[in-house]
Amino acid sequence: FENFVSPDSTTLAQVLSRSADGVKEYKALAAQDQANTELLSAWANALIEHQRQADALTLLAFALDDRWSEQLLVLWLKLADKDVKASLSQAQSWAERRPKDARLLEVLGQLAHRNGQWQDAKDYFETALKALSEKDSDKARIYQHLGSVWHALGDEHRALQYFMQAQSLATH
């Protein structure tokens, strides 16, 4: 008689975070676990708790290469500040395969903005807007980003227009 109890994602993530080679451990996971964004998010967060941000970033990038997840992309972006140029390059490689992914285009805009590449940021945000449907609630966030870009470019009038559009959408 064997009564196997499956560990929850948090427990498994804590165990996995102790491994020195996260990519090797990821590859060894069952396919269903590789696709489990809750597990991968918990694992990345456990790595962060152990002061292993670079390992968390590598794990998330590898997982995103393997299976796309907006949730993992958002977590990856939070860690992408250490080397913005490398992160921008990584996100651009994903965009080659996902050229109309509005969330990825927004991430590219955010990274370009952080890197002081205002024109590129503006272009990414505008392309992200075009990829969204007319009623998409994410438009408010993109308008907010565009307002920040125009503010950085010194065009306060345009910045205000975008900030007002963002506010208008956010209140409806």
Predicted segments with their positions:
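Repeat-based scaffolding regions
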Residues: 1-172
